[in-house]
Regions:
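Alpha-helical segment of the N-proximal tetratricopeptide repeat
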Residues: 59-93, 99, 106-110, 177
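Helix-start (N-cap) detector for alpha-helical repeat units in TPR-like alpha-solenoids
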Residues: 61, 95-99, 132-133, 165-169, ...
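Canonical tetratricopeptide repeat
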Residues: 66, 99-103, 137, 170-174, ...
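Register position in tetratricopeptide repeats
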Residues: 73-74, 110, 144-145, 177, ...
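Conserved structural position within tetratricopeptide repeats
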Residues: 89-92, 122-126, 157-163, 193-197, ...
Length: 316
């Protein structure tokens, strides 16, 4: 996952450099029972020390944030993480810290440190529950940890909060994926239909709808959907692959081979396509072609041991 730099952070961190002068000319001396007295030179000296310390802290805070954002630009996530943490240490009460925590959460999400990501996103949402990206990313983190219920709850809160269209689409995709995984394709289909209402040309949504149709027992409708998709997007590898896999499940391997042929022309570096075509060729008893495909997959990095079951079928 790509970690996005928050441009707003730059503006907010500059706020840390703003200080209001201490204009009061009197103090309440608590040590003397709350007596109101005029300021002395010692009071002014102490104020000056505090202001100097705050100014130094704020300069360090802005420096840490600037360097952290530059590190993100170089994809130096470990360095960015340390700099963001230093910024929080220097100015633990800075108004922009929720954005710093959000960035840390995104770093952890990108690194697969889902529990830590959830902690950071939760800190953001506790202070600013309206930050939709943090809620979506927490849902993704929950999903990756296998906590589908918590992921669904975050999706529900987000979708009920009238998010921006792009964020709504992402949440609907995640929700649809959870529904498919939990064997509720009718709910997934509803999610996908909403995505297509918002974004009629969304190719991934069309493919997911075909998957939901098949899961609902409507294999022919799913195939018709994929036929239309491939006709409209002949260079989409995922579309060719989805139709080939469905054709294999429908026991028409000769059609699957044609789709694998087209997909391999589009993505000759993808070993999974060669494995898929090998399976189809094995069903068609085309053993020479199947061996060539298996060998091609091995040449592309698939360990031969993982394909032993298919190589064994060549000897039958």
């Amino acid at each position: 996952m790509k970690v996005f730099k928050n441009v707003a952070l730059v503006g907010l961190c500059l706020f840390a450099l703003s200080f209001t002068s201490l204009r009061a000319q009197i103090v309440i001396d608590l040590k003397r029972g709350g007596v109101v007295r005029a300021k002395t030179i010692d009071d002014y000296r102490e104020e000056a020390k505090v202001k100097e310390r705050l100014a130094a802290d704020s300069l360090a805070y802005v420096d840490h944030l600037t360097r952290a954002l530059n590190a993100l630009g170089r994809d130096s996530l470990a360095q960015a993480e340390q700099l963001f943490k230093e910024a929080l240490r220097v100015r633990p009460e800075a108004p922009s810290n929720y954005i710093v925590r959000h960035n840390l959460g995104e770093i952890y999400l990108a690194q697969g440190r889902y529990r830590e990501a959830i902690t950071r996103f939760s800190e953001v949402l506790k202070e600013h529950p309206e930050v939709g990206e943090a809620r979506y990313e927490r849902a993704v983190s929950y999903y990756e940890m296998g906590n589908q219920q918590a992921a669904l709850e975050d999706c529900s809160v987000l979708l009920n909060g009238n998010p921006a269209t792009h964020l709504r689409v992402k949440a609907l995709f995640l929700q649809a994926g959870i529904h498919m995984k939990s064997r509720q394709p009718h709910l997934a289909k509803t999610d996908v239909e909403e995505i297509l209402r918002l974004d009629p040309d969304n190719q991934n949504a069309h493919l997911l709808e075909a998957g939901a149709l098949e899961a609902l027992g409507q294999s022919q409708n799913a195939l018709h959907k994929l036929d239309a998709f491939v006709e409209a997007h002949p260079e989409n590898v995922e579309g060719r692959l989805a139709r080939a896999e469905l054709e294999m499940r429908l026991t028409v391997p000769d059609l699957a081979v044609k789709d694998y042929d087209a997909a391999i022309l589009l993505a000759p570096e993808n070993p999974e396509l060669f494995i898929g075509r090998a399976k189809a060729n094995l069903q068609l008893k085309r053993f020479v072609a199947a061996r060539k495909d298996l060998d091609a997959a091995v040449a592309l990095g698939i360990p031969r041991g993982m394909l032993n079951a298919y190589y064994q079928q060549l000897k039958k």
